[in-house]
């Protein structure tokens, strides 16, 4: 299934020095977002920075949203994750996509201009309406949480 999403290029290096976001394989769920920096930047352990991507999107369809998710290799190998853990992009947002990057590792990390730093995933949205009740119909799980269903 393919859905058209409006994309605005805000940095002329996209499409010349750096490719447009694209799916790497037919089974890919996310498209890589790149750090559109003018120079390398070093994040000390514990540092958080906001990194421009040079792109803006307008999803338009209220049945869709975008999420910005971490790249697994950066997190596992270098401790580089998203400062807000997940970025949620509403369908009516039209500003630049920015990535909050946090170095939760023990070593400094130098990010290079054009480096792939996160991935963009388009997802369906269900808007719920609440029905006020005095009691819930009993479920098997009930109020159990935080490991109550076991480990195996």
Swiss-Prot record:
Does this entry carry the keyword Magnesium?
A: yes
Q: Has keyword DNA-binding?
A: no
InterPro entries linked: dUTPase, dUTPase-like, dUTPase-like_sf, dUTPase_trimeric
Name of the top EC class for this enzyme: hydrolase
According to UniProt, the reaction catalysed is: dUTP + H2O = dUMP + diphosphate + H(+)
Q: What would you give as a GO molecular function for this chain, any one?
A: magnesium ion binding
User: Where is the secretion signal located?
Assistant: none
Q: Which Pfam families match?
A: dUTPase
Which positions does UniProt annotate for substrate binding?
71-73, 84, 88-90, 98
> PANTHER family from the entry?
DEOXYURIDINE 5'-TRIPHOSPHATE NUCLEOTIDOHYDROLASE
The free-text function statement in the UniProt record for this protein reads: This enzyme is involved in nucleotide metabolism: it produces dUMP, the immediate precursor of thymidine nucleotides and it decreases the intracellular concentration of dUTP so that uracil cannot be incorporated into DNA.
- Protein's UniProt name: Deoxyuridine 5'-triphosphate nucleotidohydrolase
Q: Which family does it belong to?
A: Belongs to the dUTPase family.
- GO annotations under biological process? dUMP biosynthetic process; dUTP catabolic process
Question: What pathway is this protein said to act in by its record?
Answer: Pyrimidine metabolism; dUMP biosynthesis; dUMP from dCTP (dUTP route): step 2/2
What cofactors does the UniProt entry give for this protein?
A: Mg(2+)
User: Which UniProt keyword terms apply here?
Assistant: Hydrolase, Magnesium, Metal-binding, Nucleotide metabolism
Q: What is its EC number?
A: 3.6.1.23
């Amino acid at each position: 299934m393919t859905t058209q999403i409006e994309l605005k290029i805000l940095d002329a290096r996209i499409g010349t020095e750096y490719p447009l976001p694209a799916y790497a394989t037919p089974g890919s769920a996310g498209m890589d977002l790149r750090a559109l920096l003018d120079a390398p930047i070093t994040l000390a352990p514990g540092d958080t920075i906001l990194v421009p991507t040079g792109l803006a999107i307008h999803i338009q369809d209220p049945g869709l949203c975008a999420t910005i998710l971490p790249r697994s290799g950066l997190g596992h190998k270098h401790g580089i994750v998203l400062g807000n853990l997940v970025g949620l992009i509403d369908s009516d947002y039209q500003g630049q996509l920015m990535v909050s990057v946090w170095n939760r590792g023990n070593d400094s990390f130098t990010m290079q201009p054009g480096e792939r730093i996160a991935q963009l995933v388009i997802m369906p949205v269900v808007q719920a309406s609440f029905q006020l009740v005095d009691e819930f119909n009993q479920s098997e799980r009930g109020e159990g949480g935080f490991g109550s269903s076991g480990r195996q």
